[in-house]
Each structure stands twice: as structure tokens, then as C-alpha cells.
Amino acid sequence: MLNQRFCQYFQEKFFENDDENFQKFLNTIEKPILRTIRIKPGKEKVVRERLEQDGWILNPTEIPRMYQMDRRADFNPLERRLGMTMDHLVGNFYIQELAAAHPVNLLSDGRIHHEEFLILDMASSPGGKTTQLAEYFPNSFIIANEPSRERIPQLLQNLERMHTPNVAITLYPGQQWRHFHEMFDRILLDAPCSGEGTLYKGTDAVKNWHIKSIRQIANLQKKLIVSALTALKVGGEMVYSTCALNDLENEGILAYISEKYGEKIEVIFQKKFWPHIDQTGGFFMAKIVKKASIIDDIASEKLKNFNAEIKKFSKKFGNFSLRDGITNFSHRDKILAVKNAHIVAPFLEKMYFMRLGETIGFWENNQFFPNARAYRDLQIENFSKISLQNEKELDFYLRGGMLECDED
């Protein structure tokens, strides 16, 4: 049963004298929705064919390469778990809610960009939007910031699975990005919020809903968006989004920055996704352009160089050579593959990276030992091929397991 304060607030704010749509909203907000997936560029045809053979029905959506997933009548979910298919395990698609895919689609204008941008994803876990950014901006470098250490493992797992050598992970409080004054060409701020739009997942986000809590969350969001706008270059663009539906966390935040900065910024687009209208989770997003410089009232601080152990690595790999656009770095005994490294190189001394590019193996006794995913960043000559029998063996291998197999 929905919280009465929640119901009263939304009826008064959005559905006054509109009982019919209010009831539709209440009847829809908790209903489960069909899954959607985002297929990696260049993999669309083969992934669709394999999933359709497995009994899935893929219905296109308004976002390129995003499909709504339904099942044939003879479908057996115990035999065909979407998350255990080969294409999911190797990162050919990502399971992502449709509304949650819209912010990156908005930031990229729905197309793949070939410009070289430095991009900040301010609150990136679990990684759906970060991996989407890596696909839409393949020639850019993305800083995936996650302020909560507990959420880093899930982010790291998804970044590794989806292959993102043009991404680094940082662990800064969102407000700290104001110290990186006008550094980023694009910023995505998917802000922490009340989560009112996630009830379709079975969450209890509105169980203890109270306007006082909403105001507290909105105060944090104001600090985060000020930090983001300070870090954004003049002429740069950012998208602000939440999975909340109340006006304090959405339209109220836009009103706050419009009053604070006036003509220095411009909100060029905003949209709220209502479950009973858009058949998605509840969501809000807005696109903002920075027109003039913003000087924050808090002076920049000098941040310590935490990356002294990250160095370029130039030793030969024997039968291995780098794919185009990849630069090797070493961190202790680990070997890293970094795409578009020249974009982020000037900032290696300015911010601490928990992860830089992809780890592709380690160096020991003057020899390189690749890991299970190194093939994505290396050209490999004269190697033996091993046949895996099923998805379980593939999953075990990709997690670092050792398999005993006959060579082809």
C-alpha cells in the first residue's frame, strides 16, 4: 500500500481535479515493466538472431539499439536466463531500463560522436550509463565517479564485462568536483534521489515518504549540480537526471540554478517520464548548456598526486601487439590497456584513479601473462584455440577460472 503522504502530495501537485489520471498513475507506478536491453554497436544483428533463437521477442524502442524483451509462448525462463547468455557474459549487451537510457541518449543527441571529449559521470554505479557513454563517445575519455565505496565492485564488474578501456574510476564526494574548474566537455549527473520512480522493481522507496526527507535530498542535489556546473567548460553540456517524480528534486533544482546563475546557463530540454503515460519507470532529465564562466565561492584546493605508481609501459609482449588507439600503462605488476590515453594523461597528477582503463594481465619474471579478457585490446598471433562447451564454462573462464580443454 502506498504511503498516504506520497499520494496526497502527488494528487495536489500534479493531478488536481484529474482523478482519472491520478488513479491511472497509482495503478501503474508499482506494476512490473518489461525488461529492455542495449546492444553494443556492431553486434546488433548477431545478438538479435541468437536471442530470437532462444525464444526472446525483441521489440525496437525509440532509442537506437535498445529493445524491449518479451517471450514466446514456449519460452522456458529456467533454461534461458538473459543474464547467463553468451552475449551478456562477453558484454555484447547490457540489461538497462528504458527511461534510464534516455539521459545519455539526450547528452549525445542520439548519435555516436567522434570528437575527443573529457566526460564526467558524477554518480556512475552500477555502470549502465557509464558503459553507454563509452559507446556513444568512443574517441573520448570518461571519468566514472562513484562516491560510495560499497558500490564500486558492481561498477567495476560491469565496466570490465562491457569492455571500457576509455574509462577510469574515481571515488570522490560529488561536491569535490568543483575544485576541477571548467575541466570537462560533457557531464552526466544522475543524482542520488528519493527513487519514487523505481517502485516497479518492488522497492519500498516511498514507504516512509515525507516532504522533509525530500527537501534534504534536494539540498544535496543543489550542491551536486553546482559542483557539476563549476567543473563544466564554457560551451559544454550536461544532463541532470533522477528517478524521482516530485518537483523539488527535478523542476525545483532547475529553478534553483536558473536563479543562481541567470544567463550563464540555459536549460535547453527537460522531460518527466510518467509510468502511466510512457510505460517506463518514473524518471526526469534535463539538458543544460553553460554559456559563461562560473566562479565558485570556494577556492580550489591542490590535490595530492596519488598515481605515482601508474607509468607508461613499453616492453614487448612477444606474440602480442596493441590494437589501434590503445596505450599500455603499468601499476605495480599489473598491465593496463587505456584507450584515448592522451585525453586523460594531463590529469594523472590531478586526480586519484581507482581504476584506469582495463587490466589485461600482469608482468612477472620479464614475462607477460594475459588475463581472460586481454584479447579485446591485443592483436594476438600464433595462438591455440580452445572450444568452450557452454555458457557455464564461459562464465567460469571469464571469472579467471582454469579450464582443462582439448585444443582445436
Predicted regions and their residues:
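Mobile active-site "lid"/loop adjacent to the S-adenosyl-L-methionine
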Residues: 150, 186-227, 243-250
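Class I S-adenosyl-L-methionine
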Residues: 184, 237-240, 244-337, 342-343
